[in-house]
Each structure stands twice: as structure tokens, then as C-alpha cells.
């Protein structure tokens, strides 16, 4: 949903194809994940396919300059890049946890997801797919971080994010001005299942953040939202307090995990162990998330000294300083 929303908002012509459907003519992706973007050649085939939403967004910015989702202020753009990763690599853990750690949520997804690519799937095959989906996804919980011990950490983080969004959306439509950025679409993408699909987190959101639920519906298709060239971005110094509050949340959860995970990957360790939200957090090391931290540090290194100082001023006191520490 994240990338489809980006394409819609940016008015980029595209065909959206359900993977595994009879219309799926995409070649194999480099790794079996979604979304996959494919660029057609002159003969109707594909000259290139690409996975991973963050590099996809960067590539689209190069190919299509209109209705950009990258702020003109480099310091703001960097903070936006960080919050995009917070959603993609931390909030995703809560999404996975709520869906596959609760019986009601698990059963709903197990019954419905097999029908996504084929509404006419025979009942016996749907039943087999139901069991396969549940067994596979529940079996991956520990790899994602959704253990019984970590569950309360993920749930409290989700609740605080909802509370922050409820306060933020009382005054602002987006995180960095009057137009959406990378992080807006990333939070939308991870929140969509929790706000509109899975029963347990949806009930929490109805109680705590009704504004976030309706914002999420907006974000799905912002093709109607008007923007004027490169106008509408705030400077790093003018980032709303509620946007900064998301950085504070990241500083108590996402940031210590990302740093510990990168260290565990570098050391070849079998487990990540760190303190998040005042509680011990453990999970299997994740090589991709170590790469994400390296990307953040590369982006920071590419800023001018002046813009690095401005970023430091925003991150100072949030706990996210460790992301760019050398």
C-alpha cells in the first residue's frame, strides 16, 4: 500500500498488479518480497524490476520530479528519511505481532489472505492455504521480534505512536509541512493493517486515535491533494513538536535496537540483546536492518557540516543521536 499511495499522490502512470494473479506477468524479483516495481521496455516486457520501498522512492524521485515527497531542506529530508525507516523497520514489528500473536487476528488473515490472488480458489485449497499461511507466519514471529517477552514492548510503542498521531493530526495533516513526505507514506503503509484490518489493533486505535484512522484512509489516495511546485515543506527548525515526539519514541525503541542489531550482525552473534523502553529486548539478528542503519549513516555523511549541525539540533535529546554517532 505504501508504494501504491506514493504513485497515486505523485501522479505517476502505472499498472498495479496483484502478485500471483492471472495478470501477474512480472519477472522474478531479486528477492521474494513485495512491492515490486517493474519498468517496461519498448516491446511490452520488463527491462528492470526493483524491490525495497526506500530505494524505489529514491529512484522515482530521479525519474519523476513532479509532486516530490523529498523535502527541499536537506536537514528536513534527512529527518524524514529516518522516520520512514522507523515505520518500516520498527512499527512493522508491531504490525506483525498484532496479526500473528492473537488468535482472532491470525484466524482472520488465515481465512482471507489466500483469496487475495484468486477469489475462485477452491475451498479445499483455501483450507490448505489457511493452514500454510498461519503455520509459516506464526513460525516467523521470533525472527521479526514478536515474542511473548517482547510483545508488551511492541504494544506500548504502538499505543504511544497512536497517542502522538492523535495529537499531531489535531493541528497538522502531515509530518513536515503541508504536503506528505516519505515518512507519511511509510507510517500509512504499516498502520493500514492495524487500523483497518486486524481486529485487535483496530479496536485500540478506535479508542485512542480516531484521527489516525481517517488520516490513514486519506493517505491511501492523495491524488487530489494540491501542491505548488516545491512549496509546503517546513525547515528542520520548524518541525512540529509532535513530529519530534515520534523521534523521541524512536529513541527509546527503534534506535537502541538498530544499533544493537548492527553490532550483533557485525560480530556474527546469534542474538540481539538490548534495552528498549526500559525493558530487555531480544530477537534474532536481522542483516537487512543493519543495512538500513548503514544507509542512514551514509545519508548523514552526505550532508554538509552546517546541515549535520542542524540535524544534530533536532535529534539532540531524543535518543536518536546514536543513529548517526561515529
Listing of model-derived features with the role each one plays in the protein:
Residues 93-96, 100, 171-174, 200, ...:
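Intrinsically disordered or highly flexible coil/loop and linker segments, enriched in small
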Residues 105-155:
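Divalent-metal (Mg2+/Mn2+/Ca2+)-assisted nucleotide/phosphate chemistry catalytic cores
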Residues 188-280:
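Active-site/pore-lining binding-face segments in mid-to-C-terminal subdomains
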Residues 141-177:
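Short N-terminal edge-element motif at the start of the domain
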Residues 175-195:
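GST superfamily/GST-like fold recognition
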Residues 88, 162-166, 220:
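Structural signal for well-ordered, non-membrane alpha-helices
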Residues 75-83, 153-160, 164, 211-214:
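A non-catalytic, amphipathic alpha-helix used as a structural packing/dimerization or gating element
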Residues 1-124, 175, 195, 253-326:
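GST-like domain detector, emphasizing the conserved glutathione-binding G-site
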Amino acid at each position: 500500500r505504501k508504494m501504491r499511495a506514493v504513485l497515486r499522490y505523485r501522479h505517476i502512470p502505472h499498472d498495479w498488479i496483484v502478485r500471483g494473479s492471472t495478470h501477474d506477468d512480472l519477472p522474478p524479483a531479486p528477492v521474494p518480497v513485495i512491492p515490486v516495481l517493474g519498468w517496461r521496455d519498448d516491446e511490452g516486457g520488463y527491462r528492470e524490476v526493483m524491490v525495497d520501498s526506500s530505494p524505489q522512492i529514491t529512484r522515482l524521485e530521479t525519474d519523476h520530479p513532479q509532486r516530490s515527497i523529498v523535502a527541499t531542506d536537506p536537514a528536513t529530508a534527512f529527518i524524514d528519511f529516518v522516520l520512514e525507516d522507523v515505520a518500516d523497520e520498527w512499527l512493522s514489528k508491531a504490525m506483525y505481532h498484532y496479526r500473528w500473536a492473537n488468535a482472532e487476528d491470525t484466524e482472520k488473515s488465515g481465512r482471507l489472505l489466500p483469496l487475495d490472488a484468486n477469489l475462485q480458489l477452491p475451498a479445499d485449497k483455501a483450507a490448505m492455504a489457511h493452514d500454510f499461511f498461519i503455520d509459516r507466519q506464526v513460525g516467523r514471529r521470533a525472527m521479526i521480534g514478536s515474542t511473548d517477552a517482547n510483545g508488551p514492548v511492541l504494544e506500548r510503542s504502538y499505543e504511544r505512536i497512536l497517542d502522538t498521531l492523535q495529537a499531531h493530526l489535531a493541528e497538522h495533516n502531515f509530518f513536515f509541512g503541508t504536503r506528505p513526505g516519505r515518512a507519511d507514506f511509510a507510517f500509512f503503509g504499516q498502520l493500514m493493517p492495524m487500523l483497518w484490518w486486524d481486529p485487535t489493533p483496530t479496536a485500540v486505535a478506535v479508542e485512542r486515535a480516531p484521527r489516525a484512522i481517517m488520516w490513514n484512509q486519506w493517505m491511501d489516495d492523495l491524488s487530489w491533494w494540491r501542491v505548488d511546485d516545491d512549496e509546503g515543506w517546513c525547515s528542520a527548525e520548524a518541525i512540529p513538536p509532535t513530529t519530534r515526539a515520534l523521534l523521541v519514541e524512536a529513541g527509546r525503541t527503534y534506535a537502541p535496537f538498530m544499533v544493537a542489531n548492527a553490532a550483533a550482525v557485525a560480530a556474527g552473534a546469534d542474538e540481539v540483546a538490548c534495552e528498549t523502553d526500559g525493558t530487555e529486548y531480544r530477537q534474532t539478528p536481522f542483516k537487512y536492518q543493519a543495512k538500513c542503519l548503514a544507509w542512514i549513516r551514509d545519508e548523514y555523511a552526505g550532508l554538509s557540516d552546517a546541515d549535520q549541525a542542524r540535524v544534530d539540533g533536532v535529534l539532540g535529546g531524543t535518543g536518536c543521536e546514536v543513529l548517526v554517532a561515529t
